[in-house]
């Protein structure tokens, strides 16, 4: 049974998750080499920029989701963000993404925040079914994006 834990307490998985994210969202990292992103992501576990919750099973990393201080530089007035949701292919179809997302939402609410944002180019229907609302559509990285929010 997978357990959800904070990456800051299991930093041996930071570089792997950062690499998965760099590959999955390559269009967002065109100007940022992997090593730079790995350093930023690891530092973010301590400074609050990228507070990541991960799924582990027998100390094997299955995926993660982050609470990001700023995930869309063009919209600095919006914060915080659900970001970096990724499940390894072999661990999909087990409900892990939804568990991670709901736990990020619960932790955010427990800290007194009442709204979360996200952006997606291909999962707006998935998030809409889980209580997220489209705030606007925009183009970034050559793709149509949906800016979504969820009141907690």
Where in this protein do the model-derived segments appear?
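Conserved N-terminal entry element of GNAT/NAT acetyltransferase domains
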Residues: 1-16
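Helix-loop element at the rim of GNAT/NAT acetyltransferase active sites that forms part
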Residues: 11, 18-32
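Active-site rim helix/loop that mediates acceptor-substrate recognition in acyltransferases
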Residues: 26-54, 62
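Conserved beta-strand in the GNAT
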Residues: 52-54, 60-70, 81, 86
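Conserved hydrophobic beta-strand within the GNAT/NAT acetyltransferase core sheet
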Residues: 85, 116-118
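Conserved acetyl-CoA-binding loop-helix of GNAT-fold acetyltransferases
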Residues: 87, 93-106
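Conserved active-site alpha-helix within GNAT-family acetyltransferase domains
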Residues: 114, 121-144
């Amino acid at each position: 049974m997978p357990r959800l834990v904070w990456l800051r307490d299991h930093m041996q998985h930071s570089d792997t998750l950062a690499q998965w994210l760099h590959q999955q969202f390559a269009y967002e990292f065109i100007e940022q080499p992997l090593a730079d992103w790995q350093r930023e992501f690891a530092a973010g576990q301590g400074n609050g920029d990228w507070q990541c919750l991960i799924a582990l099973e027998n100390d094997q990393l299955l995926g993660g989701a982050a609470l990001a201080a700023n995930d869309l530089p063009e919209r600095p007035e919006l914060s915080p963000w659900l970001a970096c949701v990724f499940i390894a292919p072999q661990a999909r179809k087990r409900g892990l993404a939804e568990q991670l997302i709901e736990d990020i939402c619960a932790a955010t609410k427990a800290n007194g925040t009442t709204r979360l944002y996200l952006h997606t180019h291909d999962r707006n229907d998935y998030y809409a079914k889980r209580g997220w609302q489209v705030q606007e559509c925009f183009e970034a990285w050559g793709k149509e994006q949906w800016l979504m929010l969820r009141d907690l």
